[in-house]
Amino acid sequence: MERPEEGKQSPPPQPWGRLLRLGAEEGEPYVLLRKREWTIGRRRGCDLSFPSNKLVSGDHCRIAVDEKSGQVTLEDTSTSGTVINKLKVVKKQTCPLQTGDVIYLVYRKNEPEHRSGGGGISPKGSGPSVASDEVSSFATALPDRKTASFSSLEPQDQEDLEPMKKKMRGDGDLDLNGQLLVAQPRRNAQTVHEDVRAAAGKPDKMEETLTCIICQDLLHDCVSLQPCMHTFCAACYSGWMERSSLCPTCRCPVERICKNHILNNLVEAYLIQHPDKSRSEEDVQSMDARNKITQDMLQPKVRRSFSDEEGSSEDLLELSDVDSESSDISQPYVVCRQCPEYRRQAAQPPPCPAPEGEPGVPQALVDAPSTSVSLTTVQDYVCPLQGSHALCTCCFQPMPDRRAEREQNPRVAPQQCAVCLQPFCHLYWGCTRTGCFGCLAPFCELNLGDKCLDGVLNNNSYESDILKNYLATRGLTWKNMLTESLVALQRGVFLLSDYRVTGDTILCYCCGLRSFRELTYQYRQNIPASELPVAVTSRPDCYWGRNCRTQVKAHHAMKFNHICEQTRFKN
C-alpha cells in the first residue's frame, strides 16, 4: 500500500536574493539565488557558468548566505581575482556583500569594454527568472535584515559602473559586444547542489597543476620554456611570444622552447578520468590554428663561428635530430699545457731551451705554480695528437687523461678521487685555482684548512665549540686530532661508513672533509667526561641524539647533549 506522502516533492526553497546584470533594462530576466551556496566560474558544473570566457577561472568565486544571521559573503577562488566595488578581493578570503554592491569577475581598469561579470546587489522581487549561464554583468539581491522587506536596486555611482551592452538573441543565447555566448539549460537543483558541494569540499590539486596560467584551462599541446621550465599551451604562448621574448610567469629571457611530453601525457590521463573537463572540438581546432610554434623552433641551435671572409658570427646553424657524417661540426679541440699545439694556440714566442736534465719541458709548465709532491713523470710527458683530456673539477683546466695508464704505471700521479672518482689536477701538476688548499691528496696529508672545525659535529655549533675549546686547552690542532683518529681507524677502534678509506687513500677535499667529520664525531665521543666542563656533562641526552634536526638551533643545542645515539622512534 502506497503511503500518501510518497510521490510528493518538497517545494523549492524561497529565494534569498537575485543577480542582476549591470545596467539591466526594466523587465530583463535575472537569476534567483535559492541555495545556501552559489558558485560562479567557467566550469560547466558551476551554478552560473561562463564556459566560453577564458578570462574567468574554472571556479571563480562562491556566494554564500548564513541562514541564521542572513549575512551574505563572497569568497574568491580564482587565479585572476574578483573585484567588488572596484576593490580586489584577496584570494581564499571572504568579503561581506551588501545590497547595491558591484561584482566584476573580469575587471580591466583601462578597457571597460572587456569587463565581465560586473553587477550590483539588488533585493529579490517578482519577475521572470533566467537560467542563462552566460551574462556580462550581474547584480545580487539580498533581503533587508532589519525590516525583512525588500527595496529596489539603487546603484551608488552610475558613472563608475560603465555597463556593458547586451543583446538578446532569439534562441535564448546572449551576445556580449558581438561575442557569441551559449546558454546552458537549467539543471536539476539537487544535481547542481551535489556538484557544488563536491567541488567546494576539496579543491582539485591536479587540475590546478595542469592549468595554463594564460587561458586558465587545462594545458593543450603544452610546451616548456628554458631555462625556467614554466609550461603553457602552445597556442597561448604563440600569441605571447609575438609581443615579448620573456617568460609570462617569471619574466626570464627564453632561450629555448621544447615539448613537455610528460605533462601532455598527464593531461591526457586526467581527461580520461574527467571527460567533462575536456575542451570542445571548436576550441581544440582554434588552438591548433593559433599554434605558431613550428618544429624548427624546437630544435637545439648551436652558434657557428665564421671567419671575416665567410660571414658574420651571428649566423646560427640548426642541427637536425640525425647527425650527418658529412657535417663539419665537431667537438671542440681541447689543448692542455702539455700538448704540442699549446704554444701555437697561446700565440707565444718559441720556448727557450730547457734546462739540462729536463728535456722537453714546456716553459709554461715550469713557470706555473705547483704544490704537487713530485713532477718527475709529469715533466717527461707530451700529449699525443688529439689525445684524451680530463677537466679538473676544482679549476676546470684540462690535463692529460692518464688514469688508465696509472693502473699499469704507479709512477703516474693520481688524477682522481678514490671515492667520488672525479678528476683533480693537484697531484698531477698542482692546481692553480685561487684559494685551493690542495684539492687532491692522501687522506693523512689533506689540507682541510683552519675552518674545518666550524660546525664539524653535525653542523652543531655549540658541540663543535666544545671540541675546539678542548683541543685549544691541550695545545692540539685539527691535524693532531686527524693523526690520532687515523691511528684509531687503523686499529679498528674508529669506523668509517666507507670501509675502503684509510690514511693513504687518495681523496678530494669534499670526500676528505666528510670522512674527517665522521672521525671527529668518534673522537669527541671518546673524550672522558672528567676532561669536559660540568656544564657540558650535566646536560641530558636528546631523544634524537646525533640525528636530531633541531640541534642546529643554539638554545636546543645548549640544553641537550647530542653526542649520543637516537633512543626514540628508532627502527
From Swiss-Prot:
InterPro entries: CHFR_Znf-CRD, E3_ubiquitin-ligase_CHFR, FHA_dom, SMAD_FHA_dom_sf, Znf_RING, Znf_RING/FYVE/PHD, Znf_RING_CS
Keyword ATP-binding: no
Region spans: Disordered: 1-21, 113-138, 297-325
GO biological process: cell division; mitotic G2/M transition checkpoint; protein ubiquitination; ubiquitin-dependent protein catabolic process
Domain of life, source organism: Eukaryota
Pathways involved: Protein modification; protein ubiquitination
Cited PROSITE patterns: FHA_DOMAIN (PS50006), ZF_RING_1 (PS00518), ZF_RING_2 (PS50089)
Modified residues (Phosphoserine): 152
Domain FHA: start-end pairs: 38-89
Any GO molecular function: zinc ion binding
A Pfam family the protein falls into: zf-C3HC4_2
GO CC terms: nucleus; PML body
EC number, as in UniProt: 2.3.2.27
Entry keyword set: ADP-ribosylation, Cell cycle, Cell division, Metal-binding, Mitosis, Nucleus, Phosphoprotein, Transferase, Ubl conjugation, Ubl conjugation pathway, Zinc, Zinc-finger
Zn finger residue spans: RING-type: 212-251
Compartment(s): Nucleus, PML body
Biased composition (Acidic residues): 308-325
Class in the EC hierarchy, top level: transferase
Reactions it catalyzes: S-ubiquitinyl-[E2 ubiquitin-conjugating enzyme]-L-cysteine + [acceptor protein]-L-lysine = [E2 ubiquitin-conjugating enzyme]-L-cysteine + N(6)-ubiquitinyl-[acceptor protein]-L-lysine
Annotated zinc fingers (PBZ-type), start-end: 540-562
Protein modification: Poly-ADP-ribosylated. In addition to binding non covalently poly(ADP-ribose) via its PBZ-type zinc finger, the protein is also covalently poly-ADP-ribosylated by PARP1. Autoubiquitinated; may regulate its cellular level.
Main location: nucleus
UniProt function note: E3 ubiquitin-protein ligase that functions in the antephase checkpoint by actively delaying passage into mitosis in response to microtubule poisons. Acts in early prophase before chromosome condensation, when the centrosome move apart from each other along the periphery of the nucleus. Probably involved in signaling the presence of mitotic stress caused by microtubule poisons by mediating the 'Lys-48'-linked ubiquitination of target proteins, leading to their degradation by the proteasome. Promotes the ubiquitination and subsequent degradation of AURKA and PLK1.
Record remark: domains: The PBZ-type zinc finger (also named CYR) mediates non-covalent poly(ADP-ribose)-binding. Poly(ADP-ribose)-binding is dependent on the presence of zinc and is required for its function in antephase checkpoint.
Family: Belongs to the CHFR family.
Name of this protein: E3 ubiquitin-protein ligase CHFR
Source organism of this protein record: Pongo abelii
